[in-house]
From Swiss-Prot:
Subcellular location: Nucleus
Family annotation (SUPFAM superfamilies): Rap30/74 interaction domains (SSF50916), Winged helix' DNA-binding domain (SSF46785)
Keywords from the UniProt entry: DNA-binding, Nucleotide-binding, Nucleus, Transcription, Transcription regulation
Upper classification of the organism: Eukaryota, Fungi, Dikarya, Ascomycota, Taphrinomycotina
Protein name per UniProt: Transcription initiation factor IIF subunit beta
Oligomeric form and interacting partners: Component of the fcp1/TFIIF/polII complex via interaction of tfg3 with both tfg1/TFIIF-alpha and tfg2/TFIIF-beta subunits.
Described purpose of this protein according to its UniProt entry: TFIIF is a general transcription initiation factor that binds to RNA polymerase II and helps to recruit it to the initiation complex in collaboration with TFIIB. It promotes transcription elongation.
Record bears the keyword Transport: no
UniProt feature, compositional bias: Basic and acidic residues: 1-12
Amino acid sequence: MSEEKPTVRTEEDDRYEDDAGDLDLGQIGSRVWLVKIPKFLMDKWNSIPEDDAANLGCVRVKNDEIQLLLQNSPENADVPKIYNLRVMNKFVRNSYVFRESETSSSMKSTALVGTVAHECNVSPVINDDYRRVMQKRALAASAPKRKVQMIDDRGGSLLAPGTLGSRSRSTTSFIRNVKPRTGEGLKNSRIPRNELLDILFKCFEDYEYWTLKGLREYVKQPEVYLKEVLDSIAILNKRGPYALKYSLKPEYKGTMDAASVELRNQQASQSESSSIDHTGKNTSPDNPGTNAEEDEDDDGVEMIDVV
């Protein structure tokens, strides 16, 4: 006759015995939707007490469009009311929803709520109500968390022994002297237009394409002035591999030296014409007034156009 060995109980056996209970499969035929909702909507629904029987909303199906509509109640005042519901997976397999609750006998009761039929995503509809709610949330998030509190002036004399010295040490510890910036005005001072044209033609002679930032760092000129001169000789490519880069206009390509000379002559003639007074004499310091005899001597000089 065989002897029965005594069994030894462990803490693990006690733990499983406490959780022992039958799984309720009565709702296995129920089809449920697994819906992913925004976090702010989940927080709003979680704040509703479980004891209150609240109608969260309804689902409206119109042709292929599915929308989630919330109740227009004070509880939903700070959240959007209309959401688009998109079915991401129409055929879900081996996914179930369970519910676990504690009974009076301190045992957990587990029940199957239903079988997942579809997986869906919920996103708010962009309308005036949504913009108003988001604007209110943005203002609340941008509000400073710390406030300045005014403290009444404490009594006592500021000239008390040791008071003046402590104030000077406390204020000088966080006050820093800002050094004046030097050379910035000279760096951005404008140069004559003809000199800037020479520099720009030299830049495009070295490299065919330039960005506005690269030219500004190279020529050290104000951006507005540089762009004004640059637009007269170059174009901004808006497409292709050299998008947002400047290149010379077709009429200046291949004849860069001649084009630069012609533009310099035009700039010089404009500056000279501005210095001629109403008598017709040139009062420019570089070209003093000429007389009739000098004009006759210039008749024998042959002028050649540079192309």
